[in-house]
């Protein structure tokens, strides 16, 4: 429904529903289905982890 994007403004790397763009060079969307997830970069890819 609402796609999560990697927002560096909130606690470095965190997934949020807001439409704020990522300040990083490459825009990558996080594949998050739940609210409580963090963005982690693995092998040049951003993934979400539960915390």
Curated annotation (Swiss-Prot):
GO terms for biological process: chromosome condensation; sperm DNA condensation. GO terms for molecular function: DNA binding. Its main location: nucleus. It is found in: Nucleus; Chromosome. Keywords: Chromosome, Developmental protein, Differentiation, DNA condensation, DNA-binding, Nucleosome core, Nucleus, Spermatogenesis. GO terms for cellular component: nucleosome; nucleus. It comes from the Eukaryota. It holds the Pfam family Protamine_P1. Testis. InterPro entries: Protamine_P1. Belongs to the protamine P1 family. Protamines substitute for histones in the chromatin of sperm during the haploid phase of spermatogenesis. They compact sperm DNA into a highly condensed, stable and inactive complex. This is Sperm protamine P1.
């Amino acid at each position: 429904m609402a796609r999560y994007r990697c927002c560096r403004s909130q606690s470095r790397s965190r997934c949020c529903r807001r439409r704020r763009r990522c300040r990083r060079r490459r825009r990558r969307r996080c594949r998050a289905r739940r609210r409580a997830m963090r963005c982690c970069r693995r092998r040049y890819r951003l993934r979400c982890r539960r915390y």
